[in-house]
């Protein structure tokens, strides 16, 4: 079986990578190998056509490859909440915990991330 992730260096996919590398799947009787497939859309297409069994990705990305969640099932979460960081210019004087500093500001985000931020 193959598990694909779109990068090997960010913390985004660490749980999936660690599960393979530290033998979690083997202990469960599964022979799973890790494969790097970039971009994520290619990994989702490979899973759709049956050439791999698992994709480690953010849950919100699945709808890009499987509209309306057809023919795909979310097995587990790699993280809770949204693991992205909101960063601001230092000259704005933002202090930890002060959400008022974002009032009236524009926040830029990639399409699928933006959908998640709106939901929050």
Regions found by a protein language model. Give the residues of each.
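Pocket-flanking alpha-helical
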Residues: 17-20, 35-73, 84-96, 117-119
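Short beta-strand/turn micro-motifs at beta-sheet edges
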Residues: 25, 73-74
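Short beta-strand elements of ligand-binding domains
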Residues: 76-78, 111
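Short active-site oxyanion
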Residues: 32, 50-53, 104-107
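A local structural motif
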Residues: 1, 24-36, 51
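Active-site nucleophile and cofactor-binding loops and adjacent substrate-binding regions
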Residues: 9, 36, 77
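Bilobed "Venus flytrap"/periplasmic-binding protein-like clamshell domains
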Residues: 2-28, 84, 90-120
